[in-house]
Swiss-Prot record:
Membrane topology per record: Multi-pass membrane protein
Annotated gene: yfjD
Pfam families: CBS, CNNM, CorC_HlyC
Transmembrane stretches, start-end: 4-24, 65-85, 92-112, 130-150
Protein name (record): UPF0053 inner membrane protein YfjD
Domain annotation CBS: ranges: 208-270, 272-332
Periplasmic face residues: 25-64, 113-129
Entries under SUPFAM superfamilies matching the protein: CBS-domain pair, FAD-binding/transporter-associated domain-like
Length: 428
């Protein structure tokens, strides 16, 4: 290289550093890309995204290509730097060139391009793919040889090389992504997405109207009583049964009954029974996600929940499931819960023992245990493992609870002292 001028060698050296920076930045940019955004861009027809996605299908080949290119360029730059140093400073130039080149490569060919690529992966990766794609084809024999040697060495060390890493997200990972997307997703939409993810964890038992609260009509009652119940029913559908709810025979749409009553034709018990729909039964313990699909598939909106013995346990509707996703359609607190809860001036809350724990937690942002019992009475009995007497105080989690009234082996009323006053809990 004696016939090449020192200036030319320095220019070539600078070019080598730039090429090294290109390989370093390309590697970081490719590996830090958001794969899901990349797939979306590729599906939208973005050519650069398609090219990058194709390169990333074989990450081992891409990494080998980048390392081969980077190392070849750095070795060449080291040789050129040594020659330039010796020309300028003699034998001492070797040490000077080594120190200067190490600093230059470290800063300008490693740290700087990789930092920029990590901050702006798309702006680096997409343009880089224009050169990397043809380079990969050109250097395929060398890349293949390097990968073959690497795989052989890994097998010798007992490392498996045929492991396929899934690119799909787990539910917990998806939950984390939703939590961290507050700047892009509104709080309400965020809550809805998280609720959808929670549907599989919840069953119809968690949201059903308990058997004791199901309102139905005994068809053995006198006709005037039946008409009066239909006229004053606040529900869209009502269960028709014979003597006992366990002998439920059909589900009547109240609006259809009103329509028949308004017509000139005579509205009789037989007419009512013919207008009623067959009862749809839901097995106890069915996940909400499964039941929502079944409601849709069977074109049903309400079902009676039964246990393994066929006994009716409660009633569940499509609206109940949808409210778990989007929140209550009416008020922040259900009418039933509003009757069961009485806030006190001292920040405590008097609650009926039959109140649903999940509804209380949702309404007041509390954290009472929900896994083992559905009602306040059940939660306290589960904690005490005995029936308490009035005046007993129990601490469940962070809540002090006074037992106010016990009747018929059941806790009728309690007073809960939350850590934060009720207004603060609801505000959060």
């Amino acid at each position: 290289m004696e016939h090449i001028s020192t200036t030319t060698l320095i220019i070539i050296l600078i070019i080598m550093v730039v090429i090294s920076a290109y390989f370093s930045g390309s590697e970081t940019g490719m590996m830090t890309l958001n794969r899901y955004r990349l797939r979306h861009m590729a599906k939208q027809g973005n050519r650069s995204a398609k090219r990058v996605e194709k390169l990333l299908r074989k990450p081992d080949r891409l990494i080998s290509l980048v390392l081969i290119g980077n190392n070849l360029v750095n070795i060449l730059a080291s040789a050129l730097g040594t020659i330039v140093g010796m020309r300028l400073y003699g034998d001492a130039g070797v040490a000077i060139a080594t120190g200067v080149l190490t600093f230059v490569v470290l800063v300008f060919a490693e740290v700087l391009p990789k930092t920029i690529a990590a901050l702006y992966p798309e702006k680096v990766a997409y343009p880089s793919s224009f050169l990397l794609a043809p380079l990969q084809i050109l250097m395929m024999p060398l890349v293949w040889l390097l990968n073959a040697i690497t795989r052989m060495l890994m097998r010798m060390m007992g490392i498996k090389t045929d492991i396929v890493v899934s690119g799909s997200l787990s539910k917990e990972e998806l939950r984390t992504i939703v939590h961290e997307s507050r700047s892009q997703i509104s709080r309400r939409n965020q809550d809805m997405l998280l609720s959808v993810l929670d549907l599989e964890k919840m069953t119809v038992d968690d949201i059903m109207v308990p058997r004791s609260e199901i309102i139905g009509i005994d068809i053995n009652d006198d006709w005037k009583s039946i008409l009066r119940q239909l006229s004053h029913s606040p529900h869209g559908r009502i269960v028709l049964y014979r003597d006992s709810l366990d002998d439920a025979i059909s589900m009547l749409r109240v609006r259809e009954a009103w329509r028949l009553m308004s017509e000139k034709k005579e509205f009789t018990k037989e007419t009512m029974l013919r207008a009623a729909d067959e009862i749809y039964f839901v097995p106890e313990g069915t996940p909400l996600s499964t039941q929502l699909v079944k409601f849709q598939r069977n074109k049903k909106k309400v079902g009676l929940v039964v246990n393994e013995y066929g006994d009716i346990q409660g009633l569940v509707t499509v609206e109940d499931i949808l409210e778990e996703i989007v929140g209550d359609f009416t008020t922040s607190m259900s009418p039933t819960l509003a009757e069961e809860v009485t806030p006190q001036n001292d920040g405590s809350v008097i609650i009926d023992g039959t109140a649903n724990v999940r509804e209380i937690n949702k309404a007041f942002n509390w954290h009472l245990p929900e896994d083992d019992a559905r009602t306040v009475n059940g939660v306290i009995l589960e904690a005490l493992e005995e029936i308490p007497v009035a005046g007993t105080r129990v601490r469940i989690g962070e809540y002090d609870i006074d037992i106010l009234d016990v009747q018929d082996n059941m806790i009728k009323q309690v007073k809960v002292f939350p850590v934060k006053p009720l207004r603060e809990s609801v505000a959060e």
